[in-house]
């Protein structure tokens, strides 16, 4: 899966038009993802034309927390990879935008609201929208919301550490995603 992601990203970056050479790339990080139990995240963006950009992003959270007692363990571990495109009605990296993404996520969550833990893999596509406010010629502040759906292949356990399987299977999902307040640096 990672190999396919890298090949698609490489092919997409090779299609960049020469007319969009004033600003060649941006890197962004979603501040709200760090509040999600310390999820590291980054998104690279490359212009395809005046109104289109290609994005590739990743999220990573390896952390497990314990409240002084192994039975009170909780986590929201994940690794997630996405590739997509944004339409900018006015100009790239400024104003309103609409986006679509393909995404893969490997996750393990549990112990937050109940001792039940769920882990698995999600594959899907999403629709996103937002607004980018230019702070300086190289620094932007971005706000956005997203919705993604697809296939979830999962297992549920009775607690984060016991390993007793309650259920497993495949199911379709549709869920909110990418509540964004991002800092974007434009090169």
Q: Where are the regions that the model predicts?
A:
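Residues that define the transmembrane beta-barrel architecture of outer-membrane proteins
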Residues: 23-25, 36-40, 75-81, 119-125, ...
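Solvent-exposed loop/turn segments connecting transmembrane beta-strands
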Residues: 26-43, 61
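Short leucine-rich amphipathic alpha-helices used at interfaces
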Residues: 23-24, 30-31, 111, 117-118, ...
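Gram-negative (and chloroplast) outer-membrane scaffold detector with strong preference
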Residues: 46-143, 182-185
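Bacterial Sec-dependent N-terminal signal peptides
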Residues: 1-25, 183, 187
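Extracytoplasmic loops and strand-loop junctions of Gram-negative outer membrane beta-barrel proteins
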Residues: 24-27, 66-69, 110-113, 162-168
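Short secondary-structure boundary/capping segments within folded domains
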Residues: 33, 45-48, 173
């Amino acid at each position: 899966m990672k190999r396919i992601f890298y090949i698609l990203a490489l092919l997409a970056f090779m299609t960049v038009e020469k007319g969009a050479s004033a600003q060649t790339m941006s890197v962004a990080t979603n501040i709200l993802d760090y509040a999600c139990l310390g999820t590291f995240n980054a998104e690279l963006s490359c212009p395809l034309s005046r109104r289109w950009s290609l994005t590739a992003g990743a999220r990573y959270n390896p952390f497990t927390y314990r409240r002084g007692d192994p039975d009170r363990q909780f986590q929201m571990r994940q690794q997630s990879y996405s590739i997509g495109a944004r339409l900018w009605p006015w100009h790239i990296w400024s104003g309103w935008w609409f986006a679509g993404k393909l995404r893969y996520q490997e996750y393990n969550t549990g112990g937050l609201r109940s001792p039940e833990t769920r882990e698995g893999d999600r594959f899907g596509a999403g629709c996103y929208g937002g607004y980018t406010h230019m702070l300086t010629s190289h620094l932007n502040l971005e706000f956005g919301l997203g919705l993604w759906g697809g296939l979830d292949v999962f297992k549920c356990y009775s607690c984060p550490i016991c390993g007793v399987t309650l259920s497993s299977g495949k199911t379709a999902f549709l869920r909110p995603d990418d509540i964004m307040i991002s800092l974007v640096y434009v090169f």
